[in-house]
Each structure stands twice: as structure tokens, then as C-alpha cells.
């Protein structure tokens, strides 16, 4: 099994998602994504996390999200995504 570790920093927002998606291609194979450096996220940021999770699942692997701040976790709960995304 291939696992990867990655870290995202700054804001996960609409303006940055295309750039971040390109930078996170390797994370689509499963592993741990560290969000401890993320200051803020919007719904586009959550969509990025969902896409990375989807890519992992498509390969039969798992993506675990570590270090997410409370704002990100609450936003995921609000949209019911805490049942899909795996927060450590």
C-alpha cells in the first residue's frame, strides 16, 4: 500500500483551491493530511478535502485528516461531512 503524508498551510478557500489541488496530487493515494497550518477554510476548502478523500477511496485507500482547527471541523459537521471525512 502506498501512503503519503502532506501538509496544507494558510487558507483553504475558493481562490486557492485550484493551486492546492495541483499541489496535492500525490495525496490522492491515501495517507495523512496535516491541516495544523491552516488558518481558515470555506466550502471550497471542504470540497478540496472531499476530492482528496474520493481519490483515495477510488484506489481502495484511506485519507486521514490531522490537526484540523475547530472552525474546519464545525464547518464539516454543518454540511454533514464529518461522516465522510476522517478527522483524527
Describe each model-derived feature in a short phrase.
Residues 1-44, 51-88:
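STAS-like cytosolic regulatory interaction modules
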Amino acid at each position: 500500500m502506498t501512503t503519503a503524508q502532506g501538509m496544507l498551510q494558510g487558507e483553504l478557500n475558493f481562490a486557492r483551491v485550484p493551486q492546492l489541488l495541483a499541489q496535492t496530487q500525490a495525496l490522492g493515494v491515501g495517507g495523512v493530511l496535516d491541516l495544523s497550518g491552516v488558518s481558515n477554510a470555506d466550502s471550497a476548502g471542504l470540497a478540496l478535502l472531499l476530492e482528496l478523500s474520493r481519490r483515495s477511496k477510488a484506489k481502495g485507500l484511506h485519507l486521514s485528516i490531522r490537526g484540523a482547527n475547530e472552525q474546519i471541523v464545525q464547518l464539516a459537521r454543518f454540511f454533514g461531512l464529518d461522516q465522510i471525512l476522517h478527522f483524527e
